[in-house]
Amino acid sequence: MQKDLRIVIIGAGMAGILAAIKLLENNYKNFTLYEKADQVGGTWRDNSYPGLTCDVPSHHYTYSFERNPAWSRYYSPGPEIKEYFQNVFKKYSLQEYTQFGAEVKSMDFISNQWHIGFADGFNEIADVVIGATGVLHHPKMPDIAGIDSFQGHIFHSSKWQHELELGNLNVGVIGNGSSGVQIVGALGGECKSLFHFQRTAQWMMPLDNGIFSSEEQVAFQDPKIMNEAMQFDEYFDAVNRYSQALLDMESDGAKEMANICKDNLIENVKDVELRKKLTPNHRPLCKRLVWSSDYYPCLLYTSPSPRDS
């Protein structure tokens, strides 16, 4: 690598942090990591809604060189993931190369260099720009007639208002992708009434999210035991089967996953009318699957009302 190249990294989420670490590993220090927020973490910083959980196994949602034996569950809750990336950031002293509150507003490629403009008027020139901005950091509010005149509280899931007490409020959740389903599963029984508005029903894959005991967490500090726990062959086989199922709806994997989704709905939702509302009009895997073992029980035991919208 030419040592005189000026490098800029935009975004201090998991990709930006990794890029900075790898530059330092190669003894390259002529770079700056720019982050528009006041702390690192990317999507795990921006999202903090109730029930936030990763649908990738905890031990696989880490850098290969920074294993974390302290995960509390097989699928980690959002706050733990945020803490993990913040700890890695500190361990590698990346704060020395980072500027917070620096939002990029423009980039122009002039004479083989990037001319970068920031929201505060600052300008930077770089030979190389590594874009690590992600795609989910600009909340999209639905365009609903009358939304501007709504007199109650309204906010996007990525801007959760934790100071708001929901116990005596009627709450409506719009959307039934992963975020909406996780929120409803977490809010069941926590508010006066709960309504879930869905445009189309979703197929649900059960998510067995076991808790790691303190003994297991201690054992995971042994690299050999950690490698055994990660079950690389089984995990990547499952990933490959899922990918193949998406490409071939007639494959054995696709049929198996479809049957799991259908059985999950039948076994957990006995009410015929409610089951009709929750049955999609498309085959499983036509859309990205939602993974949850909390949603159906929440509907049954806390009586949130799914509404088509």
Positions of predicted regions on the chain:
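Catalytic cores of eukaryotic secretory-pathway lumenal/extracellular enzymes that build
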Residues: 62-68
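Rossmann-like flavin
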Residues: 39, 91-95, 103-105, 203-205, ...
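Beta1/beta-strand and adjacent pyrophosphate-binding region of the FAD-binding site
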Residues: 3-15, 170-174
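Conserved N-terminal glycine-rich FAD pyrophosphate-binding loop of Rossmann-like flavoproteins
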Residues: 39-62, 206-216
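Rossmann-like dinucleotide-binding core of oxidoreductases
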Residues: 19, 25, 30, 136-260
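Feature captures the FAD/FMN-dependent oxidoreductase FAD-binding
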Residues: 74-133
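Single conserved hydrophobic/aromatic residue that forms the stacking wall/gate
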Residues: 301-309
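Short beta-strand to alpha-helix junction loop
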Residues: 69-87, 251-254, 284-294
